[in-house]
Design a protein with these regions (language model features):
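Alpha/beta enzyme core
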Residues: 1-58, 75-81
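Glycine-rich phosphate-binding active-site loops on the catalytic face of alpha/beta enzymes
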Residues: 81-98
Length: 248
């Protein structure tokens, strides 16, 4: 595989001459489309791939970085234009902002384009956590696909939606089922953005009955406590609030 580093920033006519010469006079079993510094846009990738394919008839591979957050989109566009091999890394580890994340790329191809790579996507979350552990890598808890809190529901309006629709129409509430990537099932959490149904869900969980006025009082107390704590409330804190509100 011929890997012309930083090809995306080279003069296009010069680049095309170089790859054509290597393809005809040297040894090239495949060509990597290399965007070393992640500077290409999806529109530029389409142009890049089409002109490359017009010049040489070799299998194309993608190698895109995430410096501007375009690595996954660029990879998908390149595949749609005929690239056959994808270079990606688990959770996007790599130089600077990293490479196109494997998880994101796989899910985009599978759910948006119907491309099944044969990879067992239900193992992605476990694999990502393992890589993070051995690599001592920090990652946002709400990271797409494999984040630890990705399926937490704090917003009151989403909690109501989940309560009313998820049992029979799960994909009305989420873009994909957590089982698809080995994630846990959703949970409603309690914080400053909670709503009345958030409270009702947790009251049902701990088997406490409350009037509408008490539910509203509990919600106000939950919001105030969350703002003071600057974070979500745990079960012990919620039970304490419920005890205070139901007694008063």
């Amino acid at each position: 595989m011929f890997f012309p580093i930083d090809a995306s920033r080279a003069d296009m006519s010069w680049y095309l001459k170089v790859i054509e010469q290597v393809a005809t006079q040297g040894h090239m079993d495949a060509l990597a489309l290399v965007d070393t510094f992640g500077v290409l846009s999806p529109h530029a990738v389409r142009y890049f791939v089409r002109h490359t394919r017009e010049r040489i008839k070799k299998p194309l591979e993608t190698h895109f970085h995430m410096d501007f957050g375009m690595g996954v989109a660029n990879t998908v566009i390149a595949v749609a234009e005929g690239a056959e091999v994808i270079h990606s890394t688990i959770s996007g580890i790599g130089e600077r902002a990293g490479n196109a994340p494997t998880e994101d790329t796989l899910l985009a191809l599978l759910t948006m384009y119907g491309v099944d790579t044969g990879i067992k996507t239900e193992r992605l979350t476990k694999l990502s956590r393992y890589v993070r552990k051995i690599g001592r890598l920090a990652m946002p808890a709400n990271r797409q696909i494999v984040g630890d809190t990705l399926f937490d529901i704090e917003s009151g309006i989403i909690a109501s939606w989940y309560k009313n629709a998820a049992k029979d129409h799960f994909l009305e509430v989420f873009p994909f089922h957590p089982n698809l990537v080995g994630q846990r099932m959703p949970r409603v959490v309690l914080g400053k953005n909670s709503g009345l149904d958030s409270i009702r869900i947790h009251l049902d969980r701990i088997r406490v009955k409350a009037t509408d006025d008490q539910v509203n009082d509990i919600l106000l107390r939950v919001k105030a406590a969350s703002l003071k704590k600057k974070g979500l409330l745990d079960d012990k804190e919620f039970r304490r609030i419920v005890k205070q509100a139901v007694r008063s």
